[in-house]
Amino acid sequence: MVLRSEILVNKNVMPTAEQALPGRETPMSLPEFHYVFEGTPLLGPFFEGAIDFAIFGLGCFWGAERRFWQREGVVSTVVGYAGGFTPHPTYEEVCSGLTGHTEVVLVVFDKDKVSYRELLAMFWELHNPTQGMRQGNDVGTQYRSAIYCTSPEQLEQAEASRDAFQAELSKAGFGEITTEIDQAPTVYFAEAYHQQYLAKNPQGYCGIGGTGVCLPPSLQGN
């Protein structure tokens, strides 16, 4: 078994539930409204449109969140941590590698204006999903690629899009997709400081970058 001390050194190793930090019962304090969508409650309620939710992990959540809030049809975005063990972790705890969480963006979208399939196309094309426990220069389990699905339909579409994107990646000489695709776990929202970070700090770090490979047009629409 890998020891806790080894995980602190090698952050590519997932901790077990027993090794994970205990966390806390109290969630992080969040702003009431979205910083970019002025007047829009960060977590709802959302009264207009056919609202649905998507959860994506594609590396550092600062840059990922910005790309999704820029998409027409997206009505809110929140960054957080998911897929691990520690309840309500701090950013520092996630960075330690001892929570098991990856950084994610919760995307709230109007299905009448943008489809889940279109968001999946964005997800695949915005990052390199073949890198395992890293994304570019960002290394560790918190940067692993993930799609967490809120319905059986989302799970089916996510797996189909993965298979189609793998075919395109293979043609371009890339390796196997390592993206974790699963039913949605609990998303623990990140500290207020991280919410819409690049809107507050336009010159801030953004490590997001794709492979240049695209999904076939037939899989990018409704």
From Swiss-Prot:
Function: Has an important function as a repair enzyme for proteins that have been inactivated by oxidation. Catalyzes the reversible oxidation-reduction of methionine sulfoxide in proteins to methionine.
EC number: 1.8.4.11
Catalytic activity as recorded in UniProt: L-methionyl-[protein] + [thioredoxin]-disulfide + H2O = L-methionyl-(S)-S-oxide-[protein] + [thioredoxin]-dithiol; [thioredoxin]-disulfide + L-methionine + H2O = L-methionine (S)-S-oxide + [thioredoxin]-dithiol
The keyword Kinase appears for this protein: no
The protein's enzyme class: oxidoreductase
Keyword entries, A-Z: Oxidoreductase
Annotated organism of origin: Pseudomonas putida (strain GB-1)
Pfam families assigned: PMSR (PF01625)
Active site: C60
GO biological process: cellular response to oxidative stress; protein modification process
Family designation: Belongs to the MsrA Met sulfoxide reductase family.
Disulfide bonds: none
The name this protein goes by in its record: Peptide methionine sulfoxide reductase MsrA
Domain of life: Bacteria
GO terms, molecular function: L-methionine-(S)-S-oxide reductase activity; peptide-methionine (S)-S-oxide reductase activity
A GO cellular component entry from the record: cytoplasm
SUPFAM superfamilies: Peptide methionine sulfoxide reductase (SSF55068)
Gene: msrA
